[in-house]
Amino acid sequence: ASPIQQEYPIPQNSVNHDIVAIWDIYPTILNMLKLKVPVGHQVDGEDISPYFRGDSSFHRTQKIFQHFPHHHSYANFYSTCREGDWKVIYNYMDQYAHTDLYSGNGYRTAGRFPWQLFNLKDDIGESNDLAQDPAQQERLMRMARSLIRELRQADAQYPVLTRNGQAVGTAYIRMPDFPDVDSDGDGVPDLVEDANGNGVIDPGETDPDDASSFVPIRQ
């Protein structure tokens, strides 16, 4: 066995179903080499070396976010949240006109439902979109808020809307338009608590994920 196999002897025939990300490699290798992250260097990934020791008590954070607020070779303008077996995708180009986001030659898809939801345990190829399945609407609302709040907390950049080459606004994520979903079961629909549908708790709004945050007014 190589030195690394001796140092990290994964038990034979073991299987772990936790999710990890490619950006976990950097902090993991640093730990293996007993090196520290350079001062002032922000690291998105997590050290997953305990998996290689067969530490069954270790679990990486089982929520992973990706954010591509720009045009590139194989996809355009999207953000994702992976939580366990579930993955939600927000497609900015389905919410906004393509020409509003990118000045190059492209196609217009604005008007389509911008959210996608997949169960990767059953559908690793992401071919069965469950975003508009009534049975999954609450899940989508919760994951959408989780994605939006993570991006806001990270002070993420968003696509810029343009007209004739001039910036005219920002393409923020919009919550799914599911007026009947009540995620916290407090009798008040999510889009009443989050009246502007931006996924964050603004002044005068209450938390759709916390039933205790809504206090009815007594007559």
Model features per residue range: what roles?
Residues 3, 28-36, 51-55, 133, ...:
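Structured segments of extracytoplasmic/periplasmic soluble domains
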Residues 7-14, 18, 23-26, 30-116, ...:
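C-terminal cap/loop subdomain of S1 sulfatases and analogous C-terminal strand-loop tails that border
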Residues 27, 31, 46, 50, ...:
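Solvent-exposed, polar/charged alpha-helical surfaces in well-ordered, non-transmembrane soluble domains
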Residues 93, 141, 199-201:
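Short, composition-biased linear "edge" segments at structural boundaries
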Residues 123:
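Intrinsically disordered, low-complexity polar regions and short flexible loop motifs
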Residues 128-136, 196:
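Active-site-proximal N-terminal segment of extracellular/periplasmic enzymes that hydrolyze or transfer
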Residues 144-163, 167:
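Bilobed periplasmic-binding protein-like "clamshell/Venus-flytrap" ligand-binding domains
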Residues 160-161, 166, 174-219:
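Extracellular calcium-associated, cysteine-rich motifs in secreted modular proteins
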